[in-house]
Amino acid sequence: MIKNYLGRRWLNNPAIQAYVKQNAAVAHSTVFQGNLYEYTVMRELSEKLRMTKLRKTGGAHDGGVDIKGSWPVDDIYWKISSLMPNLEMASNIKRTNSQNGFVLKPLKYRIIDHTFEPLKVLVQCKAFTKSKLSPREFRELVGTFTSLVSHSQRNKTVCIMCSPHMLTKDTLNLINNITLPLIYLRVEMLKEKTDGHFDLINSGKLINYYENSYASTLMQDCKISEWLKLKLYKNSDFNSEK
């Protein structure tokens, strides 16, 4: 129901409001804007993608990761199945697929076999107001992922990059050749209203969701894109933690 979605949204907004109030004196600094963007991203990850256990980790020893959390993708899979039983769930997906030289078992089979465990998520936020992300930022993200995630955990961890801008063609080509599950989220920055307050309702939204080729193969038929496109998060209710 819509009220469940709105209720979840208001649960996330107090953290943003508290941060703004505590740091009003430096509200136009780069550091403030970066932290505010991270709180905004956390809100969208929780509300739109149902990620849980989200926490900010930014700091001198964060290893390049701004947010860590957990993603029970199976919740979305089963919720779509119950809300839209006529939505075709492909049954002819191979048990294993090859992507850029790696053999992958789609998460769907872990879900239906009841062996799935929530994915770990590593999130990096780039609150660039003018410039678009370049391939360099993604190469650095790959370095962060490989330094923090062992080979055996590669398909149990998803790397997420967030920024307010669309990707360039060159950057798209690059990330589709990256041999790890990478998701790009275009999330707006919060807009300041004429009264000086930030618009927590109509800005700071998740605009685009994009899986690279590796993530798309791994998450084949999990229906995340459909979940977002149909705005099914407005009609579902989850526990806040899992």
From Swiss-Prot:
Signal peptide: none annotated. GO terms for cellular component: mitochondrion. Its main location: mitochondrion. Disruption phenotype: Impaired respiratory growth and sensitivity to 4-(N-(S-glutathionylacetyl)amino) phenylarsenoxide (GSAO). InterPro entries: RRG7. Keywords: Mitochondrion. It is found in: Mitochondrion. Present with 1420 molecules/cell in log phase SD medium. Belongs to the RRG7 family. This is Required for respiratory growth protein 7, mitochondrial. It comes from Saccharomyces cerevisiae (strain ATCC 204508 / S288c). The lineage of its organism: Eukaryota, Fungi, Dikarya, Ascomycota, Saccharomycotina.
